[in-house]
């Protein structure tokens, strides 16, 4: 499942965040890539322990943990602290698959990368190229969203970032370990949850809603890993 979640941050908030990112000191993005990925990665990255990365990352996670659509789709158990990158001057990241497990806080905790997310901090008209290209069972998708919007997709997906030939593309990316590791099961639960929410709005007193909601929770109970 590939899902577009709009307006995590407002235009005014994005403007302030981007201004701060433009003034930050960036490092070579290869530092956080695996052996194979490092050969394909040509971008800049904010050091993970940078105060700005922590500040924006905490604000992002607070928004997402209170966002009904993200919670419904991701069913998050753990989230890897958001990272921040910049593509400019021809920077790109060729096709790769993210590492299956990421160490957090010096290896004291691990996160399985069931889901990948990218949150854009540059508007499409501010740069040429830079499309996030995702290849999975749903086909080849090119993603270039408005600033403040997020795309959520399976961590198993082959993906790349096209070269940025004009301007700069600022974004955040992170991984989520879901309560439900299989994408097909998460998709089924997401579609069921969205249907229950619509029915609750349209026919709030329908007697089948209780049974349908119970079925959702029984499936979640069957498939959850804690």
Curated annotation (Swiss-Prot):
| Enzyme class label | oxidoreductase
Concerning Pfam families, the annotation shows: 2OG-FeII_Oxy_3 (PF13640), PKHD_C (PF18331)
One biological-process term from Gene Ontology? DNA damage response
Q: Does the entry feature the keyword Metal-binding, yes or no? A: yes
Which residues are noted in the entry as Fe cation-binding? Answer: 96, 98, 159
The record's listing under PROSITE patterns reads: FE2OG_OXY
**What is the protein named?**
PKHD-type hydroxylase PA14_58580
